[in-house]
Structures are given as structure tokens and as C-alpha cells.
């Protein structure tokens, strides 16, 4: 099944109805109609379409790519990070995300100045981190985007950029072990890494301060050491007090949620012990 067929097959009805209105003509329209019939019958056969329309495999693939881009444009008019965000938030479209990421990187490299390109790499890295299911997180891609981001970061932001990327990588590795049920066996390893690889600087901005502590919170949450979660939340809240920004206030609210979450789990475990 090609990317276009997968994309159409997993669209909600309102969006499927919307892309059905895309104006097409010629061979594009013929390929589109043939694909729609195969989707309805759930009988996917590329050769059947190329033979019927008498087009080459390469021509078919080119048309599929063109039609997929038209679907993207219909549902998400803005390209770049907006389109990647649209795909990243839908678990069915992880393959589409990584495929489109390659295209968007090439486009960004040709059109963006260094500062904007660095922010593009950072945003793409964050999309994978925040929106992808763990089974779909490509740590090598996170690493590559992170390295590209750090390389283009202004000199005064190099320390923060480097720390953010390290947080992303360690968080993802913790995520892998947590999902595999191995996190408790790796407690000593990750404790050492958190204490040696993640160094918070006194000049770090509020985003980096938050992400630094969030990585630690996630680790202790995975270990079910909720008393340590509460301790780290308090440390993070104190560290953020020197800032007076809307972003800081957003982070404080998120930390309060983490605190409430930890207290909830602690109360559940206490009840189990009593019973």
C-alpha cells in the first residue's frame, strides 16, 4: 500500500469528504479514481492500475506523490512545521511524517537563513519528542535534528541548545526502557547519566530549566518513586522563580499537574498497602 492510499484510508469522514473535492484532471484524475475503487474494495494492486492506464511504475509513483501533496495542501495549507505538526499528531501517519520530514528539510535548507533553519530543526525534533508514540520515535532522527540545531545555534545559546538535545535523547532512551519494562533494571545507569550528562547552567532560560527537571521527573515517575517526583517538582518550581514571563507561568502550571499526578499515584499505592 502506498502512502497516498494509507493516508486516504485513515482519514476521518469530514476530511475524506474535503479531499474528494480537490479538482483533478487527466492522468491524475484517472489514478485517483482507480485508487478510490481499490480503497473501497480493500484490494490494493499497483500493477492493475499501471496496466489499465498504460503508465510506467515511475510515472505512477510520481503521480502518487503529486496527489499526496495536494491532499496535504487541502487539509493543511501551510507547509513546513505546520504540516509536520499535522502529521505528527496522528499516529496512523508516522510514516508520512518521516517521509515528509525529508522533503521539508531539503526545502528549509534551500530557503531559510541559518537562524530560522536552526529553529526548524529544533521544532522538528520537538514534534517527534512530544507527539510520536514511543514505537514511532526515531532516536537517530532526533539525534540528527538535534546536532543540526546545535550547530546553527548562536554562540550565546550553544550551552542551552546542547542541554536540550541531551534531555531529548535521554528522555527518549528512558521512554524505550520504560515501554520495555526494563527501567528499574537500568536505574543505576540512568541515574549516573542524569547526574553527569545533564548540567544546568545558571544562565539557562526558563525552557531549558523546565526541560532539565522534566527529564528527571519522567525518570522517577517510570521508577514509581513518586516521593522523588515531588522533590524534583519543588526544585523545578524554585528554579523557575527567577523568571517573570508567561512561559514560566505555563511551566509552573504543568509542574503542578505533575505534582497532583504523583500525589494521586502515591495515594493509590498507599491504599493497596493498607488493603
Residue ranges of predicted features:
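Structural register within alpha-helical repeat arrays
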Residues: 88, 173, 216, 259-261
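Flexible inter-repeat linkers and adjacent short helices
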Residues: 1-189
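TPR-repeat structural position
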Residues: 98, 226, 269-274
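Alpha-solenoid helical repeat architecture
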Residues: 116-120, 158-165, 203-213, 243-256
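Residue at a conserved register position within TPR or TPR-like alpha-solenoid repeats
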Residues: 177, 220, 263-265
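Amphipathic alpha-helical segments of tetratricopeptide repeats
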Residues: 106-110, 150-154, 191-201, 234-245, ...
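Extended alpha-solenoid helical-repeat scaffolds
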Residues: 217-219, 225-226, 239-242, 247-251, ...
Amino acid at each position: 500500500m502506498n502512502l497516498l492510499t494509507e493516508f486516504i484510508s485513515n482519514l476521518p469522514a469530514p476530511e475524506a469528504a474535503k479531499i474528494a473535492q480537490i479538482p483533478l484532471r487527466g492522468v491524475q484524475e484517472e489514478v485517483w479514481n482507480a485508487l478510490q475503487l481499490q480503497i473501497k474494495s480493500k484490494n490494493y494492486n499497483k500493477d492493475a492500475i499501471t496496466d489499465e492506464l498504460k503508465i510506467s511504475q515511475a510515472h505512477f509513483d510520481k503521480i502518487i506523490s503529486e496527489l499526496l501533496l495536494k491532499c496535504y495542501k487541502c487539509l493543511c495549507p501551510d507547509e513546513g512545521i505546520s504540516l509536520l505538526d499535522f502529521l505528527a499528531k496522528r499516529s496512523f501517519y508516522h510514516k508520512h511524517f518521516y517521509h515528509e520530514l525529508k522533503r521539508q528539510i531539503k526545502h528549509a535548507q534551500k530557503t531559510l537563513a541559518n537562524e530560522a533553519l536552526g529553529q526548524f530543526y529544533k521544532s522538528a525534533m520537538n514534534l517527534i519528542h512530544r507527539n510520536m508514540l514511543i514505537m514511532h520515535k526515531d532516536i537517530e532522527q532526533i539525534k540528527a535534528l538535534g546536532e543540526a540545531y546545535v550547530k546553527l545555534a548562536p554562540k550565546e545559546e550553544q550551552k542551552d541548545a546542547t542541554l536540550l538535545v541531551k534531555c531529548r535523547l535521554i528522555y527518549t532512551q528512558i521512554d524505550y526502557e520504560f515501554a520495555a519494562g526494563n527501567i528499574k533494571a537500568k536505574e543505576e545507569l540512568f541515574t549516573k547519566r542524569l547526574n553527569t550528562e545533564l548540567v544546568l547552567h545558571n544562565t539557562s532560560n526558563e525552557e531549558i530549566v523546565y526541560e532539565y527537571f522534566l527529564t528527571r521527573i519522567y525518570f522517577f515517575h517510570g521508577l514509581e518513586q513518586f516521593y522523588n517526583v515531588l522533590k524534583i517538582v519543588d526544585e523545578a518550581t524554585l528554579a523557575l522563580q527567577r523568571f517573570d514571563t508567561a512561559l514560566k507561568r505555563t511551566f509552573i502550571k504543568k509542574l503542578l499537574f505533575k505534582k497532583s499526578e504523583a500525589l494521586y499515584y502515591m495515594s493509590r499505592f498507599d491504599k493497596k498497602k493498607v488493603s
